[in-house]
């Protein structure tokens, strides 16, 4: 890691650097670099986790858009940011999530699909103490992660980050129609929010969203 410290000092993009702008999660790369340079690996880990729900998973499958945007490549080679982030995860000694004593919220949230997107949204909502229920048609969570990582790796990360959060998980529960989940005059017990995360080739339930028919729209796993 010492090899990268000189590159940190040479970085002069003190506005929003191109690497951070290219990051889908908008990780503060300069802040991360500063913490790594000072060998504050626990603080660096927190910097990543503040933006990414499951750092150990995302750092393994990340396509590293930040490196493609790094202007260092004009001189020689881009900064190996993804490798540095993986090193932070390995070197951090305190990874336990923070525990917040927040009052429970009475809004109910349904998440359809227990892949990375669904689990990430469920985690963020559960951490805000919403009543979260995840519906997954398979007999396990993870979705397409099973094609990319060993099951024990991503399950360990899910377990770690959900340490202090509660959610309801319904496996073998395929949803073909979201109407029964919605609040109506005849169904006051429906969900206030429904998050559709059915993944590549999954059921969209004909829910429209801007840009869905664009040629530039791709599933996250196809990038």
Spell out what each predicted region is.
Residues 1-8, 28-59, 75-101:
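Ferredoxin-type iron-sulfur electron-transfer modules in oxidoreductases and energy-metabolism complexes
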Residues 13-38, 60-88, 133, 137-140, ...:
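Iron-sulfur cluster-binding cysteine motifs and their immediate structural context
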Residues 26-38, 43-46, 78-79, 111-172, ...:
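Beta1-alpha1 glycine-rich phosphate/pyrophosphate-binding loop at the start
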Residues 53-75, 95-133, 137:
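Long, charge-rich boundary regions
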Residues 84-102, 163, 169-171, 203-223:
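Glycine-rich dinucleotide-binding loop and its adjacent helix/turn
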Residues 108-112, 159-204:
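Feature captures the FAD/FMN-dependent oxidoreductase FAD-binding
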Residues 121, 144, 181, 205-207:
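Short glycine-/acidic-enriched loop or helix-start segments at secondary-structure transitions
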